[in-house]
Amino acid sequence: MITLIGKDLAKKGNEFIFYGSVDECENCRFKASCVDSLEKNRKYKIIDVRDNEQKCPVHAENTVIPVEVDRSNITLLSSSKSIFEGSTFSYESADCDEECEYYDYCFPEGLVDGDKCIVLKNHGKHKGECKKGYKLNKLTLGFVI
């Protein structure tokens, strides 16, 4: 999909999380091609940068540029025993309330309950120790859309 992003951020391979639009976007003529194409709280990766700069008062450099984006792969620590490369599943967040050093991997931004995911890579056992005693595997997930 195509969206607009600040010129200084428009680099192939960059990733970002879309947290939603700001008030200034509501009456902008580029709203449909900029923020309306993105889903709030999702992580995206820039796969191509286009030409054709536009003015935008929201970005620091006052310029946006069109980019092609896809949803980013997500790194997840999971205690599931039935996960293998190529398997698909509906994501359900872990039953854990610990705020530990691995929290961002157990509850990664861009992934919400009910997402249909595919395991792209199972990196094996996570070397760190879970405070809840879970045996964790490090996974790279893609999305089934």
UniProtKB/Swiss-Prot annotation:
Membrane-spanning residues: none
InterPro entries, per the entry: UPF0179
Family listed: Belongs to the UPF0179 family.
Name of the molecule in the record: UPF0179 protein Msm_0285
